[in-house]
């Protein structure tokens, strides 16, 4: 084996560190994506987007599709709503928000399923596919969060939050943790998408150009 020149040796060291850093970033991105998918499933299912306060006429809380409102006589919570039965969802805005947040959740889960493609396809391509899926998920979450308050004027929400409740005006009710997490999820999805694009470009440029040239020259010799 011919003795490496200093420039070639430096290029190999650079390449080794470059690959190691790219793999470490890839592992972190995958872990964050997995955690984010769990967060999105919880946000989609849990009915804690808005809820009662000490000033509301009735106790209760609302989610994207399910909600619970207290009985005026007994105080017992009566729960309704199902993602499979649109007729039980109290507002068309809630239905639309559920659709977009649901699609976003499936896109994030789909990006995790794409991890298996790393064994069969070019890594840069897989990263970029996941990046576009996560960017689309961020868009869906943004639309869902913007549309959801449009349904606050429904009769069921007014029964819990009071007559002062209207579109984008919550009256006596308060925003709950699931809605806040969904808003934070928009930023999370954008960051994950940006990181995936960066990782995809790093894979495209995995080898330094000078190292590629020198390697070709060695092969010709």
UniProtKB/Swiss-Prot annotation:
Is Membrane among this UniProt entry's keywords? yes
Q: Name one GO cellular component term.
A: plasma membrane
Q: GO BP, one example?
A: sensory perception of sound
Q: Which domain of life is it from?
A: Eukaryota
- Topological domains on the Cytoplasmic side lie at 1-24, 120-128, 201-221
Residue ranges spanning the membrane: these are 25-45, 99-119, 129-149, 180-200
Question: Keyword set for this entry?
Answer: Cell membrane, Membrane, Transmembrane, Transmembrane helix
Q: Which residues lie on this side of the membrane: Extracellular?
A: 46-98, 150-179
The keyword Transcription regulation is annotated on this UniProt entry: no
Q: How does it sit in the membrane?
A: Multi-pass membrane protein
Q: Where in the cell is it found?
A: Cell membrane
Described purpose of this protein according to its UniProt entry: Probable component of the mechanotransducer (MET) non-specific cation channel complex.
Family, per entry: Belongs to the LHFP family.
> What PANTHER family does the record point to?
LHFPL TETRASPAN SUBFAMILY MEMBER 5 PROTEIN, LIPOMA HMGIC FUSION PARTNER-LIKE PROTEIN
Q: List the protein's name.
A: LHFPL tetraspan subfamily member 5 protein
Taxonomic lineage from the root: Eukaryota, Metazoa, Chordata, Craniata, Vertebrata
- Gene name, per UniProt, is LHFPL5
